[in-house]
A protein has these predicted regions:
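Serine residues within intrinsically disordered or low-complexity segments
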Residues: 4, 23, 27, 40-41
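A short aromatic-anchored loop/beta-hairpin motif
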Residues: 37, 42-230
Length: 230
């Protein structure tokens, strides 16, 4: 299966994904989640002056002081971001220790039965969507979400270089909400490396990122959830 290259974000598609009272529409997300980006070091865009940059294609890393259980020690891929309309993304470091065959009511295609499932976020948890990650030396990491079982099955069947996984739920922000949270230092931004494709490393991804940011973040990351245990 050939994965087409799409846009990093589009306000019409974000609006479509939030239509019908905020219910999840995978057909809209598939238009949003196609992004190409190259690896680089930790960065923080200037959200105070000038046009606000799109954060699509970035890893959104929860600050160690983040206490919201939905995002505590979470790493998300931002698949779409428009400052006027909001953002969409999925958590990539929370495997459910389940496979597709464990969650679907009908027998899935054989190639997908053992595909690992991740908790993608607190919204739309009754939906299962597939994603294909592919690292390209010249372009960086490419992510495609596929709606149907057949499309994802074809990608596996054709021995695509892409890594296939599935997500339950996603994360969403309204216009200006993510920017406000970033100004409050709730999130750190980082661009990913090929290690994102190593699924067995993803559960430790947040800790790995904290260690890479230096002694201060490493110390904060090591603090227990219960302050009385310090």
């Amino acid at each position: 299966m050939k994965f087409s290259e799409g846009r990093a974000g589009c306000k019409e598609d974000i609006a479509a994904a939030r239509a019908d009272g905020g219910s999840f529409r995978p057909s809209a997300v598939i238009q949003l989640a196609r992004a190409l980006f190259k690896v680089s070091s930790f960065y923080m865009p200037n959200l105070d002056d000038g046009p606000r940059p799109s954060l699509a294609g970035s890893l959104l890393v929860a600050h160690p002081n983040m206490l919201d259980p939905n995002f505590r020690r979470a790493v998300l891929f931002i698949s779409a971001h428009d400052p006027k309309d909001g953002a969409l993304g999925v958590i990539i470091n929370r495997p459910l220790d389940r496979q597709v065959a464990d969650l679907v009511t009908e027998t899935p295609p054989a190639n997908l039965a053992e595909v690992p499932v991740f908790l993608g976020g607190p919204v739309g948890k009754n939906q299962l969507m597939f994603a294909a990650f592919e690292w390209q030396k010249s372009k960086g990491l490419k992510l495609n979400h596929n709606v149907g079982l057949a499309e994802a099955n074809d990608a596996v069947d054709q021995k695509s270089p892409a890594t296939i996984c599935a997500f339950v739920g996603y994360a969403g922000w309204g216009a200006g909400q993510l920017e406000a949270e970033m100004k409050q230092k709730a999130w750190l931004l980082q661009k990913p490396s090929p290690s994102v494709l190593e699924l067995d490393r993803l559960p430790k991804l947040w800790f790995d990122i904290m260690r890479s940011l230096g002694p201060w973040y490493k110390m904060l990351a090591a603090a227990p959830d219960d302050p009385s245990l310090n």
